[in-house]
Amino acid sequence: MQPKFNNQAKQDKLVLTGKILEIIHGDKFRVLLENNVEVDAHLAGKMRMRRLRILPGDLVEVEFSPYDLKLGRIIGRK
């Protein structure tokens, strides 16, 4: 029997809204989430390919893995 891949990894992602506080280096940012927690986040690949500019004060969507809630990926701008 072949194993079934139901893309469980994508379903386990947590997405929160946050505000960019500062640019740390290149594509790394410090983000203040809606629940007043500061985390570090980096640009997702599609955001990097589109060369979207993220500035301090922008509202963004941050995706987290359930294994590491201190590091996120910026997947979109609001």
From Swiss-Prot:
Q: Does the keyword Ribonucleoprotein apply?
A: no
Return any one Pfam family short name. Answer: eIF-1a
Its signal peptide is none
Specify the domain of life of the species encoding this protein: Bacteria
GO MF annotations for this entry? ribosome binding; rRNA binding; translation initiation factor activity
**Annotated S1-like domain residues:** 4-78
Main localization, broad class: cytoplasm
Where does this polypeptide localize? Cytoplasm
| CC annotations in GO | cytosol
Instruction: Look up keyword Signal and say if it applies.
Output: no
Q: Subunit details for this protein?
A: Component of the 30S ribosomal translation pre-initiation complex which assembles on the 30S ribosome in the order IF-2 and IF-3, IF-1 and N-formylmethionyl-tRNA(fMet); mRNA recruitment can occur at any time during PIC assembly.
Family listed: Belongs to the IF-1 family.
Q: What does this protein do?
A: One of the essential components for the initiation of protein synthesis. Stabilizes the binding of IF-2 and IF-3 on the 30S subunit to which N-formylmethionyl-tRNA(fMet) subsequently binds. Helps modulate mRNA selection, yielding the 30S pre-initiation complex (PIC). Upon addition of the 50S ribosomal subunit IF-1, IF-2 and IF-3 are released leaving the mature 70S translation initiation complex.
Q: Which PANTHER family match?
A: TRANSLATION INITIATION FACTOR IF-1, CHLOROPLASTIC
What is this protein identified as?
A: Translation initiation factor IF-1
Give the species. Answer: Mycoplasma pneumoniae (strain ATCC 29342 / M129 / Subtype 1)
